[in-house]
């Protein structure tokens, strides 16, 4: 909160915890702190009973993270109706019965289908629908992963042009998993990605606000290489990034 978060994402999924009980207890503690309670909350769980219990604890408008078409239309609509009944907005993952949408074509197919189901069958308020078209890991050395960031950005633009009032979000840390151990480079990659995704219409992102890097502060050489990787501009972009990565390993992170 003190580092500038505008919404709090709360997750209690852990094999060692009773997630439903812990979520309820933790939300009640949060509600007792005025500094924390003033922010909107996002309830994050893979178990719908945990989400449902959490929404019953929240007084203001919450966001559910997340539902998908993974288990089919009937389960999706049933749960979305309950979310609406409890007054929350909804993040919808680009995931259906066939699996996670990784390409641009699959992302817009799944998001378009989910939007139509929600708005036509449930009359779910479109301004309360937030799509997560899957931010996936790039710079892995595998050619099939090269366009993942660009496909997310393109899907974001398509959603804003074709699904009226819907929003777009995503978990940005997924993008840079291939750079684990090089925190500055990871955060610089996130900054470049967000710069382009926001221009395409991205509305919100799950990030660590205490370690963010400012786009304008990224060295020109690194910025060019990161944009080549994210926008898929060169076949050798990943190799060029790896070649300069070590020189940024000790670069300090500063809170913004």
What residues fall within each predicted segment?
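Glycine-rich, proline-tolerant flexible connector loops at the mouths of alpha/beta enzymes
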Residues: 2-39, 98, 135-143
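Catalytic beta/alpha-barrel core
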Residues: 9-16, 38-47, 62-72, 126
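Active-site-adjacent loop and "lid" segments of alpha/beta metabolic enzymes
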Residues: 20, 58, 62, 72-77, ...
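Active-site loops and adjacent core secondary-structure elements that bind or stabilize anionic groups
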Residues: 157, 163, 174-256
């Amino acid at each position: 909160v003190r580092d500038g978060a505008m919404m709090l994402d709360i997750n209690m999924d852990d094999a060692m915890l009773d997630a439903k009980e812990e979520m309820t207890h933790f939300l009640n503690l949060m509600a007792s702190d005025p500094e924390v309670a003033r922010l909107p909350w996002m309830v994050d769980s893979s178990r719908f009973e945990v989400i449902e219990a959490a929404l019953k604890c929240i007084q203001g408008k919450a966001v559910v993270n997340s539902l998908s078409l993974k288990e089919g239309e009937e389960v999706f609509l049933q749960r979305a109706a309950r979310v609406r009944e409890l007054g929350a907005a909804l993040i919808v993952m680009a995931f259906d019965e066939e699996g996670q949408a990784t390409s641009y074509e699959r992302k817009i197919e799944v998001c378009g289908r989910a939007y139509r189901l929600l708005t036509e069958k449930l009359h779910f308020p479109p301004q309360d629908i937030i799509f997560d078209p899957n931010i996936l890991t790039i710079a892995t050395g595998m050619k099939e992963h090269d366009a993942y960031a660009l496909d997310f950005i393109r899907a974001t633009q398509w959603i804003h042009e074709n699904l009226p009032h819907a929003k777009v979000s995503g978990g940005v840390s997924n993008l840079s998993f291939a750079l684990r151990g090089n925190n500055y480079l990871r955060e610089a990659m996130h900054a470049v990605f967000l710069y382009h995704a926001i221009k395409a219409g991205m509305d919100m992102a799950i990030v660590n606000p205490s370690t963010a890097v400012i786009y304008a502060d990224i060295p020109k050489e690194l910025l060019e290489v990161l944009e080549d990787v994210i926008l898929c501009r060169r076949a050798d972009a990943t190799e060029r990034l790896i070649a300069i990565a070590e020189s940024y390993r000790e670069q300090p992170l500063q809170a913004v």
